[in-house]
């Protein structure tokens, strides 16, 4: 997660209530259905944290309350809301007298069963549970849940089928490829079966035996066909086949008279059968990301349908029959090919959410005034030049997103949308923000980035509920004073404008948490910023700032400070007073050294000093034991030639980027950085990798492309954590360049292992050549060159032991000593050849050269 995303998450906490209210009224998911069905109402309970028995289907539908312009800063919570299609089932049944509190009271009893079935060895030893054992475990007439998610199961645990009282069975995220062998008496009470993410290729015909099944989830598998026997599941209410390989819509589903929710999103459907209207109870239908080229008319005759998702298809028009969807509340058709909207769509008087982003719409009809219940309208990424004034009749509208169109102005009467909370008009041709926007008393999020706006009306100060404002990349000359009067404003971005001065009024915005002013015309770090004692994130990058005021010490909450691409020539010591600072970016300045006071930044985690003018590596950085990420690459700055051994003091370092320098070697103690996960050292002059590099057991990314490496260490395959490697653009001989091109560690490791074996054999042959051909005089000279003492080579029976044997024994001793230095067989060979050359053993050299030529000609 980036720092911006982290701050956005803080802001999302503030507006979570708004989102929750908006979503609960928008009818986007089955949980928002305001009907009497317990099944549907439970999903709504889930969103409020009430439901106790749920399973989830993951899918990539977009969050309807987030503009595409802010997608880069969505919080994790929003990502989950984008992906989840909730489905739930009530644990209270007609005729069941047990209350929820009673069930909770018996948790300890049935937890024994869950623990027993969830044992680590369950994949190897199937549990045998007799009726007597079931009683001992407390299995009675209760609604028991068995959760075996991610237990490494290779096959369906058949013995579970014999347990009478299991009602909810979760087997997600295993490796169950199929399940068969059920008998007519098995799992008679099973109501929920979830087999997501297992690699299932099909469903067995025995599925029909699960007569009481109400929810079946087999999403994220490899299923290409739905068996006809599924039509026998008369009690089924929810079916989830999301993200499979289904090409034909299962016609047998028409027999499922109680089906309420059907998810077939992300399959390969091209056609919907005309028999679909037989599903008269269907309320929620997901067909997103299929291959539909037309809007299936059969969908228009589902009388109870309230939510329809056709996102990501190839639909170019809507049929007139769409008017028959009288109860439809949510229609999602983002990422299609729509060029116009059939006028009949405006007869859907109950519509509450309409998403049409990323189409080719040029006009919206004035009949939009019919949508009196509309809460959410998403029209991003179309070709709209104007929005009809009649949109002001959509009095319930809460979210209006119009980004990435061709709008020059807002609708005249937009101020009548009293319930509007989000207005996003990014990347259009807006020249100004109309004064009447000040009447939007409930507005919380306002985004106008990427337009040609020159100023912001002072009247915006009346919008006292605004939390977030985006005005980046416009033509604003002066900091908008009206923004300084917004007491609820937490997030403000005015990047990419022409602001040169900061007014004193900003010092009153003490509630600000996140402020972005990069790419403006600021010459100084204004002291008015220093009054923002709650500010956590400040981006002043790409300005012309040269120094920092001493009063910055007042910014006690500051966690992230971006000062890249400014005019700093010396490191601002004033920054060292920011005890809570976690992220500092001073890249692309003119820094030559760093103050030793930087050690006062006790909580610093991320530093970016790339593209500066350091003469040497700033050794002061090595004091920062809390540092996790360091970037000192110099693509634009002065090149570093060496790294200090003290680098190993940064014991918490996880990411190190030393790329684009002139570094010749990696410190020999690099292995002491035990937490290192990512090492980027590309485009340097490194010719050798120290053995301690192989001690980095957590290393996942290693980029050494563009260096002078001729060989890789044989034991590199021992770094089991490595996931990404890059040795491109090195003069590699061992292994050859073509072996490394695929960036596959297994391939490289296999080559090196075989090369090691080959080098050992060659070295032994060289030993024999030397031993069989060396003279007594040359042998003595060779021992001297190899630093072998006479005591190591003299033998008590020298007169009876041949010169050949003594020479071979000496070479073995030399090899044993050299192995302590972690020298490879190839390195030993090269040393021996140099020594033979120095003593003038040319005849032996000729024989070794012939051997080398012969072995290179043989592929292994």
UniProtKB/Swiss-Prot annotation:
GO biological process terms, semicolon-separated: signal transduction
PROSITE patterns registered for this protein in UniProt: DEATH_DOMAIN, LRR
Region annotation Disordered: where it falls in the sequence: 1-103
SMART domains on file: LRR_BAC, LRR_SD22, LRR_TYP
Protein known as: Leucine-rich repeat and death domain-containing protein 1
Chain ranges of the Death domain: 764-852
LRR repeats: 139-163, 164-186, 187-210, 211-233, 235-256, 257-279, 281-302, 303-325, 326-348, 350-371, 372-394, 396-417, 419-440, 441-463, 465-486, 487-510, 512-532, 533-555, 557-578, 579-601, 603-624, 627-650, 651-673, 675-696, 697-719, 721-742, 856-860
Protein keywords: Leucine-rich repeat, Repeat
Compositional bias segments (type: Low complexity): 90-103
The UniProt record lists the keyword Membrane: no
GO cellular component: cytoplasm
Coiled-coil region(s): none
Cystine bridges: none
Source organism superkingdom: Eukaryota
Bias type Polar residues, positions: 50-72
């Amino acid at each position: 997660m980036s720092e911006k995303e982290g701050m956005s998450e803080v802001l999302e906490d503030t507006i979570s209530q708004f989102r929750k209210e908006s979503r609960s009224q928008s009818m986007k998911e089955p949980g928002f259905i305001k009907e009497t069905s317990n099944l549907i109402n439970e999903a709504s309970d889930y969103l409020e944290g009430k439901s106790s028995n749920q399973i989830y289907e993951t899918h990539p539908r977009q969050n309807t309350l987030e503009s595409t312009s802010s997608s880069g800063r969505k919080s994790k919570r929003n990502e989950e809301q984008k992906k989840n299609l909730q489905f739930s089932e009530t644990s209270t049944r007609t005729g069941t007298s047990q209350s929820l509190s009673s069930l909770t009271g018996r948790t300890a009893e049935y937890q024994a069963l869950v623990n027993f079935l969830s044992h680590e060895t369950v994949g190897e030893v199937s549990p045998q549970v007799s009726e007597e054992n079931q009683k001992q475990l407390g299995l009675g007439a209760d609604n028991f849940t068995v959760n075996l998610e991610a237990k490494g199961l290779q096959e369906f645990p058949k013995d579970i089928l014999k347990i009478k009282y299991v009602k909810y069975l979760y087997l997600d995220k295993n490796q169950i490829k199929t399940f068969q062998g059920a008998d007519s008496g098995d799992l008679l009470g099973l109501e929920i079966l979830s087999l997501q993410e297992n690699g299932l290729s099909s469903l067995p015909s025995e599925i029909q035996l699960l007569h009481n099944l109400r929810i079946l989830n087999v999403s994220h598998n490899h299923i290409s066909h739905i068996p006809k026997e599924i039509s026998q599941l008369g009690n089924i209410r929810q079916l989830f086949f999301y993200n499979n390989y289904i090409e034909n819509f299962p016609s047998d589903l028409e027999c499922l008279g109680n089906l309420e929710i059907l998810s077939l999103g992300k399959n390969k459907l091209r056609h919907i059968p005309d028999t679909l209207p037989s599903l008269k109870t269907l309320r929620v239908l997901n067909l997103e990301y299929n291959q539909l080229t037309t809007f299936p008319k059969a969908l228009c005759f589902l009388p109870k349908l309230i939510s329809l998702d056709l996102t990501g298809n190839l639909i170019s028009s809507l049929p007139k029959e769409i008017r028959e969807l009288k109860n439809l509340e949510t229609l999602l058709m983002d990422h299609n090919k729509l060029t116009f909207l059939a006028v009949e769509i405006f007869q859907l008087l109950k519509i509450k959410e309409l998403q049409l982003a990323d189409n080719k719409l040029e006009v919206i009809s004035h009949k939009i005034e019919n949508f009196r219940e509309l809460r959410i309208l998403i029209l991003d990424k179309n070709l709209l030049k104007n929005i009809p004034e009649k949109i002001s009749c959509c009095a319930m509208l809460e979210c209006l997103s119009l980004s990435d169109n061709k709008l020059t102005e807002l609708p005249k009467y937009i101020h009548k949308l009293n319930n509007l909370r989000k207005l996003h008009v990014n990347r259009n041709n807006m020249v100004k923000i109309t004064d009447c926007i000040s009447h939007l008393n409930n507005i919380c999020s306002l985004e106008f980035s990427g337009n040609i706006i020159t100023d912001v009306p002072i009247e915006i100060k009346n919008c006292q509920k605004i939390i977030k404002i985006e005005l980046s990349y416009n033509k604003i000359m002066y900091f908008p004073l009206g923004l300084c009067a917004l007491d609820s404003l937490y997030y403000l971005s005015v990047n990419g404008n022409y602001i040169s001065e900061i007014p004193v009024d900003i010092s009153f915005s003490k509630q600000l948490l996140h402020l972005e002013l990069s790419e403006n015309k600021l010459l100084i770090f204004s002291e008015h910023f220093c009054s923002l004692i709650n500010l956590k994130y400040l981006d002043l990058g790409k300005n012309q700032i040269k120094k920092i005021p001493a009063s910055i010490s007042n910014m006690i909450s500051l966690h992230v400070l971006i000062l890249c691409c400014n005019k700093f020539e010396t490191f601002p010591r004033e920054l060292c007073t920011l005890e809570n600072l976690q992220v500092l970016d001073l890249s692309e300045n003119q820094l030559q050294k760093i103050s030793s006071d930087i050690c006062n930044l006790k909580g610093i985690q991320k530093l970016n000093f790339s593209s500066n003018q350091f003469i040497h590596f700033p050794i002061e950085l090595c004091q920062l034991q809390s540092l996790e990420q360091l970037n000192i690459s110099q693509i634009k700055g002065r090149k570093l030639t060496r790294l200090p051994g003290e680098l190993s003091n940064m014991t918490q370092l996880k990411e190190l980027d030393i790329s684009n320098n002139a570094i010749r070697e990696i410190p020999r103690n690099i292995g002491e950085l035990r937490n290192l996960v990512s090492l980027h050292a590309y485009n340097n002059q490194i010719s050798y990798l120290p053995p301690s590099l192989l001690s980095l057991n957590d290393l996942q990314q290693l980029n050494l492309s563009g260096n002078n490496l001729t060989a890789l260490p044989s034991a590199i395959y021992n770094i089991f954590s490595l996931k990404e490697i890059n040795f491109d653009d090195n003069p590699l001989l061992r292994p050859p360049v073509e072996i490394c091109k695929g960036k596959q560690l297994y391939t490289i490791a296999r080559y090196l292992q075989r090369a090691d074996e080959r080098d050992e054999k060659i070295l032994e042959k060289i030993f024999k050549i030397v031993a069989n051909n060396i003279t007594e005089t040359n042998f003595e000279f060779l021992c001297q060159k190899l630093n072998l003492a006479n005591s190591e080579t003299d033998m008590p029976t020298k007169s009876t032991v041949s010169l050949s044997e003594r020479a071979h024994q000496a070479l073995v001793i030399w090899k044993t000593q050299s192995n302590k230095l972690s020298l490879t067989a190839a390195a030993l060979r090269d040393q021996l050849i140099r020594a033979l050359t120095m003593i003038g053993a040319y005849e032996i050299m000729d024989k070794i050269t012939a051997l080398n030529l012969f072995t290179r000609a043989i592929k292994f």
